[in-house]
Amino acid sequence: LYQLKSNPLKGDNSFQIKNVIIEGYEKSNISEIENSVTEFKGNLIGLNFNSIKEIVESSEWVKRASIKKVLPSTLKINVTENDPYAIYFQEGKSFLIDLDGSIITEINLNNYEDDLLFVRGENSPELLEQLIRDISITFPNLTQTLEEVEFIEKRRWNLKLNNKLLVKLPDENIQQSLKNLKQLFEEQEVMESNIIEIDLRIQGRAALKVLDGKINYGIDEI
């Protein structure tokens, strides 16, 4: 809870803003939000709440904001912050992103300690949520082992697991391929094996690369 008690909007009107209360923040820049609010002149009765809402929501970390007037002289702002889901790499920079692909803020990866999913590839943030949804529906345990996802040539995904296993998904029918992958994991104990790559780009087939060569493994459609 943050409360600005001074009156930055000078005037004698009885409904002039004298208090600004900001709630729901943890990582948002409160000074930035405060300054954005104090730029508005007027009283609570004639204040443009949509404009304030838009400006507050343009601040880093703020996903949504609700604005409420509390007569006679208080403006109450409640913010909902973005929830970092992954780290997106683009042109040598690192960004925190939400599951829906919203870029939250740029970070220095060397100073960031949270263990988040790595995301690479053009257009990958916008398509991340659908990928995670497909995995959660067909092979939910896989989300626990995901370390990095990369959108290749703006058409398909590569998945890298925390044991460095690489999974190449096809352009289409991702859910079916994930079902096949789940079957393969169950039958071959993949995480404990010497398999280093599973290529699922050809529907109904899995090309397995192991440490000492490459073998083919047929998977019937489920």
Which sequence ranges carry the predicted segments?
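Aromatic-capped interface at the extracytoplasmic side
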Residues: 1-23
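Buried hydrophobic packing residues in well-ordered domains
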Residues: 20-22, 33, 56, 62, ...
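Periplasmic/extracytosolic POTRA-like scaffold domains at the N-termini of outer-membrane
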Residues: 21-60, 108-133, 137, 172, ...
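Flexible glycine-/small-residue-rich
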Residues: 24-26, 79-83, 108, 121, ...
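Short, glycine-/polar-rich solvent-exposed loops and beta-turns at beta-strand/coil boundaries
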Residues: 49, 67-73, 110-111, 151-152, ...
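Membrane-embedded segments
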Residues: 53-83, 102
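Extracytoplasmic segments of membrane-associated envelope/inner-membrane machinery
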Residues: 75-153, 160, 166
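Extracytoplasmic/luminal low-complexity segments enriched in Pro/Gly and acidic/polar residues
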Residues: 172-222
